[in-house]
Amino acid sequence: MNQHLLATTTPTAELAGVSLAYTLGEPVLRGLDWRLLPGQVVGLLGRNGAGKTTLLEALLGLREPQTGTVRLFQQPAHRLDDAARSRIGYVPQQSDLFEAFTPAQLLAYFKSFYPRWNEAKVNGLMSRWDIARDKRISKLSVGQQQRLSNIRALAHHPDLLVLDEPVSSLDPAGRRDFLAELVEQVLERGTTVVFSTHILSDLERVAFNLAFMSGGRIALQAPLDELMDEVRVLTGTTAEVQALLQRLGAGSLKRTPLAGGRERVMARLPAGTQWPADADAQAVSLEDLFMELT
């Protein structure tokens, strides 16, 4: 999406100056700004305790920040009307399924809240993912419960899908199958997706954009393919590295001092430019980006 469209498209969600702290604790979110546009698939990355779950709960209006604003579909997130709520799908990190229900009872209950509920899709996924309809949820395996949560979130074709570690209890085959279903949903409906996971290979399969969370803020958000093309690691004396950055117009993302007046710099070129062949620049992996930027 070009920069003009980015500037003019009405966001699905927008957070501005959001700060949130738990009682008597340090702030978890610190003046955070974030925009999610229609059709974006964003992988949210951060260390344990960085505040990813808190951010997603604030995004959905489940936690109200002390300062700043959160808007979903042009409404305050904590005061959404029923029509706006019916456009959201959510898989929380901790299961919120009604364990005394059977899957059939649970899905019938939630069906009443969503005008776009797709019963054929539900039936297909229940069969494909081998979930017993009439077995009490408390008796299902952890992986089956996670699949059921995912079905509930996908069933009504949401315009915003928020996934907090949605595949952590699935085996590799189960993760791949869910991710394929997720990609199909995005391609069919242009769903906006926020996907938080520690499994970096999963993000490489589905996330077109990455958001790196550090210090209670979104430190960087950019398309994954652009980051792979534009980010390199430079190592040399401070003077050598600085001269190369200035010559190329590159920006520094992370600087690490080394012995002997040398430094290691993760740098990013301006969009539309390329690293010259003579530059002593090391390509980066998604793991490198995660380690340096979170």
Regions found by a protein language model. Name each.
Residues 2-31, 38, 81:
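A short, flexible loop at the N-terminus of ABC-type nucleotide-binding domains that lies
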Residues 45-47:
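The feature captures the beta-strand-to-loop junction immediately N-terminal to the Walker
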Residues 60:
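Helix-to-loop junction immediately C-terminal to a conserved catalytic motif
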Residues 68-79, 83-84:
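Conserved ABC transporter NBD signature motif
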Residues 92-148:
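ABC-family P-loop ATPase nucleotide-binding domains
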Residues 161-165, 170:
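Catalytic Walker B motif of ABC-type/P-loop ATPase nucleotide-binding domains
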Residues 176-267:
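ABC transporter nucleotide-binding domain
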